[in-house]
Each structure stands twice: as structure tokens, then as C-alpha cells.
């Protein structure tokens, strides 16, 4: 099994990169987000690899971090999500944004990924809600929201407030952190309008 490739970029395709390792070139399939972060041909590259072995083929999937690779595997534990859809999700959302979306039960955020319909998005946020924090890698906003929300799912006001802040130009991480802080500082039970005000107050500090 191949766990990591270290070499130079030989060629970048639409959905893959060719990695030259001491004269042997490996095809690693990557998300569009990962491909956009790569350098130019001839530059050094390090990719974390997930190896798929099938009866008639061997396929490599490449990632910029071990965390992204873990998410790739976790996403595929949900029915209806294969390698192609998992890569599409990781191209649409960073691991941190994905963790936030699951913590908030934010189905529309996940459904933005090509190939992810409402039913698959629902399965993802439902089945992964108790698994996602282990893959955030730090005490991020997803964990903060989970702590404030307890074991329940995010209420409509919470989801609406996060969505409103992102519409104002804040990143999902910033919005989720702000709403988590708002809930902690007296916003529990508040409607979306109040949560938005409290969230903006947190962001202005």
C-alpha cells in the first residue's frame, strides 16, 4: 500500500496529477481544490495517498494533508457517497468548513457539492454528526458549536444566523465561531435576529 508520495510534479491534468518519484510516474487523482494548490511541473510535491485496489485496477487518490484523507474515507462510510462524490465535497468545503456544516446540520452547505442531492446531504449530516469532531484536528468552531448545542442538532435560528453572517461576507469558520460564542454568552434560546446581532458583536471584538 502507498501512504505518501514525495517527488516532483510531472504534469497536472483535469482531475489528477502525475508525480515523478525517481523516474517512476504515479497518477494521483485529486480534488479540484488540491490541484489548484499545487505548484508547476518540476516543483517538489508531497501528497498523502489513499490506495484503492480493485480486481481490474489500482487507483491512487492524493491529498494535501492526512486530515483531508481521513475525511475522504469518512465521507465514503455514508451510503451514496463514493470516491468521486467525496472528492467533490472536499473540493467544495475545507475539512474545517465540512466539520462546521455537520455540527450545524447545514444540509444546503454540503448540497453545494456536485453530485450531492438533498437525500445524501441529509444522510451525511445525520450519520456523521457524532463522528466529525474527531476529525477536526483542533478545538475548532465545529466542536465549539457541538458543545453549546449538546447532543441535539442545530436549531433553525442557529443555522439561519450562521448563513446570514456568511452572506455578509464572513467565512463559515468565522460565522460558526461567532455564533458558538454568542450561544455561550447568553444567546441560548434566542431567535435568529438576536443571534445575528450577538454574532456581529463577537466579530467586532
Swiss-Prot record:
SMART domains, alphabetized: HhH1 (SM00278)
Region of interest called Domain II, as start-end residue ranges on this chain: 65-143
Keywords in alphabetical order: Cytoplasm, DNA damage, DNA recombination, DNA repair, DNA-binding
UniProt-recorded Gene Ontology molecular function terms: ATP binding; four-way junction DNA binding; four-way junction helicase activity
BP-aspect Gene Ontology terms: DNA recombination; DNA repair
Cross-referenced SUPFAM superfamilies: DNA helicase RuvA subunit, C-terminal domain, Nucleic acid-binding proteins, RuvA domain 2-like
Its biological purpose: The RuvA-RuvB-RuvC complex processes Holliday junction (HJ) DNA during genetic recombination and DNA repair, while the RuvA-RuvB complex plays an important role in the rescue of blocked DNA replication forks via replication fork reversal (RFR). RuvA specifically binds to HJ cruciform DNA, conferring on it an open structure. The RuvB hexamer acts as an ATP-dependent pump, pulling dsDNA into and through the RuvAB complex. HJ branch migration allows RuvC to scan DNA until it finds its consensus sequence, where it cleaves and resolves the cruciform DNA.
Identification of the protein by name: Holliday junction branch migration complex subunit RuvA
Species this chain originates from: Allorhizobium ampelinum (strain ATCC BAA-846 / DSM 112012 / S4)
